[in-house]
């Protein structure tokens, strides 16, 4: 026998044993039966036309009257019931970041900035 025939026989047996020439057309994938509900995250935003939002908003006039009445930033934090939450979040940057996203904390920071701007050192 010639050497080329031996190589062809070896190559053929190799292809057969490794199933490289397999005729199996079965796809091994999950079958989709029907539409399924996807769990997507949705971030809700405040409505633009909310009537209560202006009543609860901390505007310049309210901050001015609070400062004239002698309300300190600590007093305002106590009024918003944030003192315990701030103390609890003081050791964790993640907790403080989460607290900073709340409406009450934003109000407190706005009042803090107002007091810092309008109080002489």
Swiss-Prot record:
Which comment does the entry carry about domains?
The RxLR-dEER motif acts to carry the protein into the host cell cytoplasm through binding to cell surface phosphatidylinositol-3-phosphate. The WY domain contains 3 alpha-helices and is required for the interaction with the host MAPKKK epsilon.
Residues annotated as coiled-coil are none
The reply on keyword Zinc is: no
Q: In UniProt terms, what is the effect of altering residue 109 to D? A: Prevents the ability to oligomerize and the interaction with MAPKKK epsilon
Ranges where the record places region WY domain: 57-121
Q: What UniProt keywords apply to this chain's record, in alphabetical order?
A: Host cytoplasm, Host nucleus, Secreted, Signal, Virulence
The protein's predominant localisation is: secreted
Give the top-rank taxon of the lineage listed in the UniProt record for this protein: Eukaryota
* Family from the record: Belongs to the RxLR effector family.
Q: What induces it?
A: Expression is induced during host plant infection.
Q: Where are the transmembrane segments?
A: none
Record's subcellular location: Secreted; Host cytoplasm; Host nucleus
Q: Where is this motif: RxLR-dEER?
A: 38-56
Q: State what protein this is by name.
A: RxLR effector protein PexRD2
Gene3D superfamilies found in the cross-reference section: 1.10.10.2470
Q: What does this protein do?
A: Effector that enhances P.infestans colonization of Nicotiana benthamiana leaves. Induces a weak Cell death response in N.benthamiana. PexRD2-induced cell death is dependent on SGT1, suggesting that PexRD2 is recognized by the plant immune system. Interacts with the kinase domain of the host MAPKKK epsilon, a positive regulator of cell death associated with plant immunity, and perturbs signaling pathways triggered by MAPKKK epsilon.
Q: How does it assemble?
A: Homodimer. Interacts with host MAPKKK epsilon (via its kinase domain).
């Amino acid at each position: 026998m010639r050497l080329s025939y031996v190589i062809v026989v070896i190559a053929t047996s190799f292809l057969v044993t490794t199933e490289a020439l397999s005729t199996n057309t079965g796809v091994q994938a999950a079958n989709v039966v029907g539409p399924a509900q996807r769990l997507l995250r949705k971030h809700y935003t405040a409505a633009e036309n909310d009537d209560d939002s202006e009543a609860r908003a901390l505007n310049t006039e309210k901050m001015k009257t609070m400062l004239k009445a002698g309300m300190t930033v600590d007093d305002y934090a106590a009024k918003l019931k944030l003192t315990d939450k701030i103390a609890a979040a003081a050791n964790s940057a993640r907790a403080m970041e989460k607290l900073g996203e709340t409406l009450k904390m934003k109000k407190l920071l706005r009042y803090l900035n107002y007091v810092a701007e309008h109080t002489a050192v």
